[in-house]
Design a protein with these regions (language model features):
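Terminal accessory regions of large proteins
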Residues: 3-6, 14-170
Length: 170
């Protein structure tokens, strides 16, 4: 923990392990909120995870993986330029399962009856299967939909693009 590092390096006069939440640079996009404690108004507020925000971030990351921007098996950006090579967009293995980057860079955000095999809701279900396993796929998809308050299909068709753009605007 931070306190131990401060002591090991003799930085007690320079640093404190106590950091106000508003100075933490992660978790600043609505992932958490502070709510009154059950102990009353005078008690310290309790940190609450906003699962809907976290699920929306997971979906945006998953779409990034589908498009090749990120890879499941490597940290950082993968394809960050307009002309990827065949090697960069080649399928790869993750947890022993084959993962494919979208071949044309277009993910339809449409209802399931649209006829496109790379439709975003279908790709999302496959992403969940590959990342978290087939055994828990239905449970995980149900949880995601519960957090969103709608089906993945409804989310992709109606809200994904708006939420995704908002996430990356400064």
């Amino acid at each position: 923990p931070p306190r131990q590092f401060i002591e090991i390096y003799g930085l007690q006069d320079e640093l404190t392990p106590d950091v106000p939440i508003d100075e933490i640079t992660i978790l600043q996009q609505g992932e958490i909120s502070f709510v009154p404690s059950a102990e009353g108004e005078d008690a310290p507020k309790v940190m609450k995870w906003n699962d809907d925000v976290i699920i929306k971030q997971l979906i945006s990351y998953a779409v990034g993986c589908m498009m090749g921007r990120y890879r499941l098996d490597k940290p950082g950006l993968h394809i960050a330029h307009p002309e990827p090579t065949a090697e960069e967009i080649a399928p790869y293995s993750y947890h022993g399962r084959k993962y494919e980057i979208d071949d044309d860079g277009i993910l339809p955000l449409m209802n399931s009856d649209c006829g496109f095999s790379d439709n975003a809701p279908l790709r999302m279900a496959d992403f969940v299967r590959i990342v978290f396993g087939e055994e828990t796929q239905v449970e995980n998809l149900n949880y995601m939909e519960q957090c969103l308050g709608k089906t993945l299909e409804q989310y992709f068709v109606k809200d994904f693009w708006k939420d995704h753009k908002k996430m990356y605007q400064n």
